[in-house]
């Protein structure tokens, strides 16, 4: 099993999970054009996709889906609550028209999943789990194949004991490191209301939040940790990485020495992480 973050940031997120027999696109927050280009860049033909999995309806995770479905023939795996929210966009200027276009795009090709019940796509078992975020039915998941476990959780405001338990024993973790607390407070382009939303317990995880988890709760099993959903206005990639690495180094004797911290990028895919 292998994974690549096709692109990740405040403006768009897409991840690819693949085995020898199955390839799944997780979220379509990039433009359809960029998703297709980045699939090609890492050697994947879009015709080989077995499904598109949508974790929640926000535009930075589902904004490219409608146009992407003009090209793709594979089904869309989506929960009932998320589908309902996706088909009733709140912030669209042409809400009724956009809703119809979205329904036309995925109405007949969607597969209902539940955010608290395991499901399978091809030979990949998905173990979803709810995470605290201000969306209709947002979830993270652990993808399993041949004994390997890869977790992905991008949009969530804080760690919970339930999340901690789900992440134990994972070989790789794609996790949010959205903002620096100080940079968010000082950000001149974000309104006070937006800053409050981002920093809330149902908003987005900070570098500092992740550092505390790495120091106190992380079990040290993952060979790779990929930092995702970095804010372009309230974070710095070097700061995010050094904050995470410092937390690991502080407990170095307790952890495997080869744990790698990788930065995702909004503009290009990460290299494959393979098991």
Where are these regions (language model features)?
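Metal-dependent catalytic neighborhoods of phosphoester/phosphodiester hydrolases
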Residues: 63-72, 87-95, 236-242
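Metallo-beta-lactamase
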Residues: 80-140, 144-147
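Active-site metal-binding motif and surrounding structural segment of the metallo-beta-lactamase
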Residues: 33-81
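Cap/insert and terminal regions of metallo-dependent hydrolase folds
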Residues: 161-264
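Conserved beta-strand hairpin/beta-sheet module of binuclear metal-dependent hydrolase folds
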Residues: 1-42, 139-155, 172
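Structured catalytic core of nucleotide-sugar glycosyltransferases
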Residues: 5-14, 57-65, 83, 126-129
